[in-house]
């Protein structure tokens, strides 16, 4: 398998993992139970995405997934509860990971630069929420980031 084929497998598998994450979170949102199986599954999804992104050098994805993994580890350890606020944060984080994956397929430099700048702003905002949760705070949605102007 050459590098482009391996990258395609990565993209496909991450897409499936993100779909799984979304299904788990939507189920938890509509029928909150905080079951160990759900928590473990969410942790594994984020852990796998982090590791796979690291193998390919997709640092932006790996760093973001690392903080999500740390948060999910706190949930697994019983330090955090999988409540509605956390589910909503994880859904937004899942969408952000999906957008980061889409950026990998953008070929035009100017479009990639604008999209990347917008995603950087979004990532900064989400990471502040994730890190606040890790440090013991509640989920308080950060202000919407300003979109970068097209160049």
Language model features with spans:
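Non-catalytic helical tethers at domain boundaries
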Residues: 1-151
């Amino acid at each position: 398998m050459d590098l482009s084929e391996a990258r395609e497998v990565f993209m496909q598998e991450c897409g499936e993992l993100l779909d799984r994450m979304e299904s788990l979170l939507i189920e938890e949102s509509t029928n909150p139970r905080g079951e160990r199986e759900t928590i473990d599954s969410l942790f594994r999804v984020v852990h796998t995405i982090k590791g796979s992104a690291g193998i390919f050098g997709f640092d932006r994805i790996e760093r973001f997934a690392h903080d999500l993994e740390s948060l999910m580890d706190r949930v697994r350890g019983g330090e955090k509860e999988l409540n509605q606020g956390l589910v909503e944060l994880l859904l937004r984080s899942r969408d952000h990971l999906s957008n980061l994956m889409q950026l990998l397929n953008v070929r035009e430099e100017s479009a990639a630069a604008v999209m990347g700048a917008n995603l950087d702003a979004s990532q900064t905002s989400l990471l502040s929420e994730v890190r606040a949760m890790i440090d013991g705070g509640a989920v308080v949605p950060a202000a919407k980031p300003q979109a970068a102007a097209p160049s």
